[in-house]
C-alpha cells in the first residue's frame, strides 16, 4: 500500500501542484481517500488557502479501499502520531474512532443544516465527532443504449435484471460482456452486497445494538448473488472484484449493469470512457415482493485528537464541510451533497441531471450497523460473502457461520 502527499513542492507522476505560501504560519496535513478524487479536493483547498493567509494544507492520499485506508489510519492513531491533522473517514468509522479517543469533538456545532442521516452518523454519545464530507449511496448503473436497443426498461427487481441481462447477452453475442458486476471481493462493498437483498426482504441486522439475524433472508441473499455467477450473468471470478474493478469494467464497455457508488459517474463520462453518454442511473432492484433499498455511504472529516493545531484543523473541516464546497464537489467530482437544497440547485442539476432524483434514494438509504466493533462485524460478513461466491461455502452453511460469529460480537 502506497501513501503519498500531494503538495506544491514538486511536480511528478505521483504529486499534484497547489498554490500557497512558501512559508506558512500553520501547515496542516489532511488524509483523503485516493478513490474520491483528491485532485478536486485539492482545488477546494486551494480556495481555502487563498482566503486564509498563513495556512498551507498538504493532502496525503492512499488506499483503494475503505479497509486499506482504515488500516493505515488505525496504525497512525494507535501510535498517537501527530503528523495527520484531518482524517477523511468512511461513514462507518466515526463511532469507532471516537470511542478509541482518536478524534476531537466539535463542541456546540449545529448539525441541523445537514441531511439528518449524516448528522446522526457523526454524533456519538451526544458529541459531534466529525463533520460530513459528502453523501453517498449505491445505485444501479446500466447501459442505456443497449436497453433501448432491446426495448427493455430499467429493472425494478433482481429477477427482471436477470431476464434483461440474458436477453441482451444472447443478442449481443459478445463473450466479454457481463450482465452484472458487483462487489464480491472481501472488502467493505461486500457487506453492502449481502445487505441489499437482506434489507429488501424487510429484515434488519441489528436493533438497539443487538443482533437481529434472520437466517432465511441471509440464505436468500447469498443464494441470489451466487445465482448470478452460476447462471453466467456475472463473471466466474466475481469473488475477486472490488469496487473500482466494477467501475473500470463498466467504463470499458464490458458490463451491462453495475452496482456502484456515485463517484463512478464522472469516470463514465470521461474522455477515455467507452460508455460516455450511454449510461443510465436507477434505484437498485428489489427481491420479488420486497422493497427497493440501498446501502448508505458517504465520508466524513474528523480532526485527529493528536493534532498540534486543533483550532486550525477544525476551521479547515468547517470549510470543507460547508455548503459551498459541497456544491463545488457535486459539480466537479460527482460527490453527492450533504445538504438537501443542493439536490435542486440549478447549477448542480445542470451539471449532473440525475442528482435531481437522487435525494429520496439517499434519504431512505439504510445504514450498516453503528458499533465500536464494526471492524469485526464487517470482517465476518465480507469474508463469508466472498467464501460463497468463491464456491468454498454453501449459502446455508455460510449463513449459520455468519450468525454464530456475529452473535459473539453483538451480544
Question: What do these predicted ranges mean?
Answer:
Residues 25-35, 55-61, 85-86, 129, ...:
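Short, well-ordered beta-strand elements
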Residues 27-44, 62-64, 188, 290, ...:
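Extracytoplasmic "Venus flytrap"
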Residues 29, 47-117, 121-123, 145-156, ...:
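Extracytoplasmic "Venus flytrap"/periplasmic binding protein-like
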Residues 36-56, 381, 399:
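Short, polar/charged alpha-helical segment
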Residues 89-138, 153, 162, 173, ...:
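Hinge/lid segment of periplasmic solute-binding proteins
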Residues 140-144, 296-309:
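A bilobed periplasmic-binding-protein/Venus flytrap-type ligand-binding module shared by bacterial periplasmic
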Residues 165, 210-239, 284:
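Glycine-centered hinge/linker elements that transmit conformational signals in sensory
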Amino acid at each position: 500500500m502506497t501513501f503519498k502527499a500531494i503538495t506544491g513542492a514538486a511536480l511528478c507522476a505521483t504529486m499534484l501542484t497547489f498554490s500557497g505560501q512558501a512559508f506558512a504560519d500553520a501547515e496542516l496535513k489532511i488524509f483523503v481517500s485516493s478513490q474520491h478524487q483528491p485532485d478536486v479536493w485539492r482545488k477546494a483547498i486551494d480556495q481555502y488557502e487563498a482566503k486564509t493567509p498563513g495556512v498551507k494544507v498538504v493532502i496525503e492520499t492512499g488506499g483503494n479501499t475503505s479497509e486499506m485506508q482504515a488500516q493505515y489510519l488505525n496504525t497512525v492513531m494507535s501510535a498517537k502520531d501527530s503528523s495527520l491533522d484531518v482524517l477523511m473517514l468512511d461513514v462507518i468509522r466515526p463511532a469507532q474512532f471516537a470511542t478509541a479517543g482518536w478524534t476531537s469533538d466539535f463542541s456546540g456545532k449545529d448539525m441541523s443544516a445537514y441531511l439528518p442521516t449524516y448528522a446522526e452518523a457523526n454524533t456519538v454519545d451526544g458529541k459531534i465527532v466529525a463533520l460530513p464530507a459528502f453523501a453517498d449511496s449505491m445505485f444501479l448503473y446500466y447501459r442505456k443504449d443497449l436497453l433501448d436497443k432491446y426495448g427493455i426498461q430499467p429493472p425494478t427487481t433482481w429477477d427482471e435484471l436477470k431476464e434483461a441481462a440474458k436477453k441482451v447477452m444472447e443478442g449481443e453475442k459478445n463473450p466479454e460482456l457481463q450482465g452484472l458486476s458487483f462487489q464480491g471481493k472481501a472488502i467493505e462493498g461486500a457487506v453492502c452486497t449481502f445487505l441489499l437483498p437482506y434489507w429488501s426482504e424487510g429484515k434488519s441486522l441489528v436493533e438497539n445494538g443487538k443482533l437481529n439475524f434472520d437466517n432465511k433472508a441471509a440464505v436468500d441473499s447469498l443464494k441470489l448473488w451466487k445465482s448470478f455467477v452460476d447462471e453466467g450473468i456475472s463473471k466466474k471470478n466475481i469473488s475477486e472484484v472490488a469496487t473500482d474493478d466494477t467501475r473500470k469494467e463498466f467504463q470499458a464497455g464490458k458490463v451491462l449493469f453495475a452496482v456502484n457508488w456515485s463517484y463512478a459517474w464522472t469516470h463514465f463520462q470521461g474522455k477515455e470512457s467507452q460508455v460516455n453518454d450511454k449510461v443510465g442511473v436507477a434505484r437498485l432492484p428489489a427481491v420479488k415482493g420486497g422493497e427497493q433499498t440501498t446501502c448508505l455511504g458517504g465520508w466524513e472529516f474528523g480532526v485527529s485528537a493528536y493534532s498540534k493545531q486543533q483550532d486550525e484543523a477544525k476551521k479547515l473541516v468547517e470549510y470543507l464541510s460547508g455548503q459551498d464546497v459541497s456544491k463545488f464537489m457535486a459539480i466537479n467530482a460527482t460527490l453527492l451533497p450533504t445538504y438537501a437544497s443542493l439536490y435542486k440547485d440549478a447549477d448542480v442539476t445542470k451539471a449532473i441531471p440525475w442528482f435531481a432524483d437522487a435525494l429520496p434514494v439517499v434519504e431512505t438509504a439504510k445504514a450498516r450497523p453503528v458499533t465500536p466493533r464494526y471492524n469485526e462485524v464487517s470482517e465476518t460478513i465480507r469474508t463469508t460473502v466472498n467464501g460463497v461466491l468463491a464456491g468454498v461455502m454453501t449459502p446455508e452453511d455460510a449463513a449459520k457461520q455468519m450468525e454464530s460469529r456475529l452473535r459473539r460480537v453483538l451480544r
